[in-house]
Amino acid sequence: MADLDDIKDGKDFGIGIPQQNPAFTLKGSGSLDWGMQSRLARIFNPKTNRTVMLAFDHGYFQGPTTGLERIDINIAPLFEYADVLMCTRGILRSVVPAAANRPVVLRASGANSILTDLSNEAVAVAMEDAVRLNACAVAAQVYIGTEHEHQSIKNIIQLIDQGMRYGMPTMAVTGVGKDMVRDQRYFSLASRIAAEMGAQVIKTYYVDSGFERIAAGCPVPIVIAGGKKLPERDALEMCYQAIDQGASGVDMGRNIFQSDAPIAMLKAVHAIVHKNENAAAAYQLFLHEQN
């Protein structure tokens, strides 16, 4: 029990000094609740408001694809070099050590794989389970321009509404309709719709022409998908151009774990995202770390 006989009156109240309330400066996030800001601050480094995510959730529709046959062997050694891990709850519980101490963006949608339209997804994780797993955000696809666009929008709305209740951010991942052109106009549309629905983070693709308009027209942070495996120099150039044009980070998978030197690649991407290195300097870092 506290000793009530030794309570001393406080003296240093800083009279005349206004209380300090630093603003939460992540794009579009200043009015969010404390818990949601706290989770976002674990995803996005508060010093740079940027992030390097390692995506290895591909198995939810691709199965044990190249590089993901054994998460414990191929991916676990990369954890310490990423800011954030993006995976499914099955992999998180079975393979990712809690002691890895990395924020997690939890894949929360899934459905078809090889037989029918991939865009026909459903919410695959209850928000209570995401909270139980100490996730920092949940992620679901939104398929603009597909037969199942309406369902995918309902999915993210469900997650957003539940997330607001629990202080859990939602990352909307823009899927591409098979009849849509992968251009600035499409990704601007998809990103803006997801943000208008209330998603706190958008994951979309980099395009060579007009990406700065995609980023500027989206009121919340955008992280780019790595997409298919590219030569390392090209992947780093894509990363640099995206950051230079307004992206708040990257969420790379195949361009990391299918690289011959994945740790070196993560270090090079980190240099671009957090240290503003250009692609040429980052590639030299990759070559140095590779050796």
UniProtKB/Swiss-Prot annotation:
It is found in: Cytoplasm. Its EC number is 2.3.1.245. It catalyses: dihydroxyacetone phosphate + acetyl-CoA = 3-hydroxy-2,4-dioxopentyl phosphate + CoA. InterPro entries: Aldolase_TIM, DeoC/FbaB/LacD_aldolase, DeoC/FbaB_aldolase, FbaB-like, LsrF. Keywords: Cytoplasm, Schiff base, Transferase. The keyword Hydrolase does not apply. The keyword DNA repair does not apply. Signal peptide: none annotated. The active site is at 203 (schiff-base intermediate with substrate). One of its GO terms (cellular component) is cytoplasm. One of its GO terms (molecular function) is fructose-bisphosphate aldolase activity. Coiled coil: none annotated. CDD domains: DhnA. Homodecamer. PANTHER family: 3-HYDROXY-5-PHOSPHONOOXYPENTANE-2,4-DIONE THIOLASE (PTHR47916:SF1), FRUCTOSE-BISPHOSPHATE ALDOLASE CLASS 1 (PTHR47916). Belongs to the DeoC/FbaB aldolase family. Involved in the degradation of phospho-AI-2, thereby terminating induction of the lsr operon and closing the AI-2 signaling cycle. Catalyzes the transfer of an acetyl moiety from 3-hydroxy-5-phosphonooxypentane-2,4-dione to CoA to form glycerone phosphate and acetyl-CoA. HAMAP family: LsrF. This is 3-hydroxy-5-phosphonooxypentane-2,4-dione thiolase.
